[in-house]
């Protein structure tokens, strides 16, 4: 039976990562693949949704002349409009990516790529998020100035996706992170989230009128424990596959309830 797949991202509808993933998925599977993605770069937007301004959907042509839908909003907006206005139904799968830059650790809540995947899962679709490690922000925010091998990552995502098609989907979201030197033979490791992906840094600067302004930046963390997504990608150079859930309830709920319920 033909699958319905909604393909989204946070790097914008004209990203080469999105195009590579669309082409590989379309060629491999019996699927209707519909692209609904932001008009502009939306990195770091998380699962933000537009409540105070109207949204527009514009049909557009991708680089291979196939059709996509550009949304004047966030990745989450793209999923909402994709489900309710473009497809007018919940797809079988929402696939978000290929993101330029890895999405690792608990900081993934800031990721528009993951935000879209979580929104897809919230609507009842099976969701995957996929990201490719890059070594510098230059590659992430100035796509096209240096070559990035999206096709290898797209094929790795395809191969991982295949593993879950024959089984009941095991969780709400599958988060896939691919090291920048990966091949199709790179080992795949099932991981948990690391605590941190970056060590945050705030740089203060002074404008011509002697007022302070700030840039937020971070330094990659390399020394997370074995078994985490950060360690798998950055140290072992493996593909990381992390199962995620929409339920953010603390794991120690019973202990918490026993300790605190009588205090309220």
From Swiss-Prot:
InterPro entries: SurE, SurE-like_Pase/nucleotidase, SurE-like_sf. One of its GO terms (cellular component) is cytoplasm. GO terms for molecular function: 5'-nucleotidase activity; metal ion binding; nucleotide binding. The keyword Transmembrane helix does not apply. Keywords: Cytoplasm, Hydrolase, Metal-binding, Nucleotide-binding. The keyword Transcription does not apply. A divalent metal cation binds at residues 10-11, 43, 99. Its EC number is 3.1.3.5. It is an enzyme of class 3 (hydrolase). It catalyses: a ribonucleoside 5'-phosphate + H2O = a ribonucleoside + phosphate. SUPFAM superfamilies: SurE-like. It is found in: Cytoplasm. Pfam families: SurE. NCBIfam families: PRK00346.2-1 (NF001491), surE (TIGR00087). Belongs to the SurE nucleotidase family. This is 5'-nucleotidase SurE.
């Amino acid at each position: 039976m033909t699958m319905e797949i909604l393909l989204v991202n946070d790097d914008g509808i004209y990203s080469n990562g999105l195009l590579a993933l669309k082409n590989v998925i379309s060629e491999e599977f019996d699927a209707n693949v519909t692209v609904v993605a932001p008009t502009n770069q939306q990195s770091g937007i998380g699962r933000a949704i537009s409540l105070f301004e109207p949204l527009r959907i514009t049909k557009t042509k991708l680089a291979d002349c196939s059709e996509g839908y550009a949304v004047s909003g966030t990745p989450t907006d793209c999923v909402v409009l994709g489900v309710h206005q473009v497809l007018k139904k919940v797809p079988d799968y929402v696939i978000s990516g290929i993101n330029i830059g890895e999405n690792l650790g608990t900081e993934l809540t800031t990721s528009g790529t993951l935000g879209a995947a979580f929104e897809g899962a919230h609507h009842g679709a099976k969701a995957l998020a996929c990201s490719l490690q890059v070594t510098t922000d230059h590659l992430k925010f100035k796509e096209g100035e240096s070559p990035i091998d999206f096709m290898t990552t797209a094929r790795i995502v395809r191969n991982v996706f295949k593993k879950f098609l024959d089984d009941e989907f095991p969780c709400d979201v599958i988060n896939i992170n691919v090291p920048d030197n990966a091949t199709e033979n790179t080992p795949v490791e099932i991981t948990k989230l690391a605590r941190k992906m970056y060590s945050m840094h705030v740089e203060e600067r002074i404008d011509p009128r002697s007022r302070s302004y700030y840039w937020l930046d971070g330094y990659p963390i390399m020394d997370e424990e074995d078994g985490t997504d950060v360690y798998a990608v950055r140290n072992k150079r493996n593909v990381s596959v992390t199962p995620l859930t929409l339920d953010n309830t603390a794991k120690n709920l019973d202990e918490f309830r026993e300790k605190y319920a009588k205090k309220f």
